[in-house]
């Protein structure tokens, strides 16, 4: 048995990712539509979606007074079966392509309606 020089970590379960937003309900509904997820909490200042009601992690959108002003320090990456079709679908939902200085890459950087960056990846390399 290996002895660690520090206490073993607690058993952690990833509950959710918090997303600051100007309009939690509108942004949460947009992401629910984009991901095909379900709404599990719809309160005035908090709006939570999950892949299924009892499946984690979720996305919890919370109201903040300030607007987003700089590039995200954390963003989500998605790998669809068909990158081109998924980018077209997300654009039709209201996403936008984003140029954050990434240059030509095999992924597409996009933003949601409040300007939060995320990436749509290409096919996984074998």
Predicted regions and their residues:
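Short hydrophobic/aromatic beta-strand micro-patches
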Residues: 18-20, 77-81
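Short, conserved charged micro-motifs
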Residues: 26-28, 82-88
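Short connector loops at helix/strand junctions that flank enzyme active sites
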Residues: 44, 54-56, 69-73
């Amino acid at each position: 048995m290996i002895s660690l020089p520090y206490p073993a970590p607690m058993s952690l379960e990833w509950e959710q990712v918090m997303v600051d937003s100007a309009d939690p309900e509108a942004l949460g509904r947009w992401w629910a539509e984009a991901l095909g997820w379900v709404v599990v909490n719809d309160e005035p200042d908090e709006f939570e979606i999950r892949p299924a009601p009892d499946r984690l992690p979720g996305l919890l959108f919370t109201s903040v007074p300030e607007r987003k002003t700089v590039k995200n320090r954390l963003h989500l990456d998605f790998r669809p079966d068909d990158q081109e079709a998924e980018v077209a679908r997300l654009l039709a939902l209201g996403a936008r392509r984003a140029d954050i200085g990434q240059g030509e890459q095999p992924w597409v950087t996009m933003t949601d309606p409040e300007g939060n960056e995320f990436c749509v990846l290409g096919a996984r390399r074998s």
